[in-house]
Structures are given as structure tokens and as C-alpha cells.
Amino acid sequence: MTRAKTLHFLQNYAVLILIALLVVALTLLSDSFLTGRNLLNILNQNAPLAIMAAAMTLVISVGGFDLSVGAIFAMGSVTSAWLAVNVDPYLGLLLAPFVGLALGYANGLAITVLRVHSFLATIATALIFKGIAVAVSDGRLISARIDDFTWLGRGKFLGVFNSVWVMVLFALVLTFLLTRTTFGRRVFAVGGNEEA
């Protein structure tokens, strides 16, 4: 393998190689790391982050930045938990995605209509959204220990956490959209040349 090919390979697969090395090291250091229970816990704990990262694929593919994704997640979570405790758990579950959608739409308007660079727009909205989330929660954890509300994160199907199933479904749908639809081709086209 030539030096150029080696560099190209490392650029494309460096993250996967590092993850593999980390898994090997952790397996050698701990007998309990490479167990089904631990791996399921890792997947469950990282499912929300993986879903956000998958969604960020769309933003990055069109050549944008979204630094407010964490704040939007916080707003959706706080809204959902507050509604679950004070109004109705199902209303909390139903409205959380729409909160995220509305805030993301506001970002999109700031970027496309007001022509604010995505980096600056999302830094500003991140501060605003995070401030609202802290104000609504009064800076404290909102504990929603309601069975009808917590089944999505703590419940299991076929021995696997429901959140992991949601993550896998989300990844499959997004992969299909990006690789097999006109929408996906347009996303990559905009990322290649916004003016076109």
C-alpha cells in the first residue's frame, strides 16, 4: 500500500480504528466490559446522542453548522418532563418532537430568510433555548417517574431497551432517505454547491 493510499485509508477510517482499539483496551482492562448487559447499557445511554448525531448528518451534508442541537434537546426534554408531571404524560411525549421541530424551523428561518450564517445563528439560539430550558425547570431536575412516560427509555422489547430500537429505526430511515430518495440527492447537491 502506497503512502497516499495509507493516508487516505486512515482519514476515512481513523475513528473506527480508534474505537476498535478502545474496545480492545477496555476488554483487556475489565472482565465486565464486553458483556451483553454492559453493551446494552452503553447503547441505551448513548441512544439520544446517537439520534442527535444522525440528525446532524443532514445539517453537515448541506454544509451547515448547528451548535444549538444540545439546547434544542434540552428544551424538548424539559417541555416533555414538565408536561408529563403537570399536565399529561402522553401530551409530554407528543409535544417534545414538535418543540424540537419548531425551534429547528426558527433556526432555519434565521439562516435562510435573515441570511445569518448558521454558525452565528445557532450559537445565539443555543443561548436563548438553554436559558428558557433553565427558566422552565428552575435550574433543577424535573423528575417524571410515571410508568406511562418512562417506558420509552427504560422499557425493553426482546431484551433490548426501547430507546435502542428507536435509535436503530431512526438510523435506518435516515440512511434510506439519504441514499435512496430524491430528497437525499438534493441534500448532497446543496452541500456541494449552495448557489446551484
Language model: regions and residue ranges:
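Structural signature of hydrophobic alpha-helical transmembrane segments
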Residues: 14, 38-50, 89-99, 164-165
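Transmembrane helix-bundle core of multi-pass membrane transporters
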Residues: 114, 118-181
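Alpha-helical transmembrane segments within multi-pass membrane transporters and channels
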Residues: 87-126, 169-172
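Structural signal for alpha-helical transmembrane segments and their membrane-water exit/capping regions
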Residues: 18-35, 62, 133-137, 176-182
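Single transmembrane alpha-helix segments in multi-pass membrane proteins
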Residues: 24-86, 109-116
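Membrane-helix/interface signature in polytopic inner-membrane proteins
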Residues: 173-196
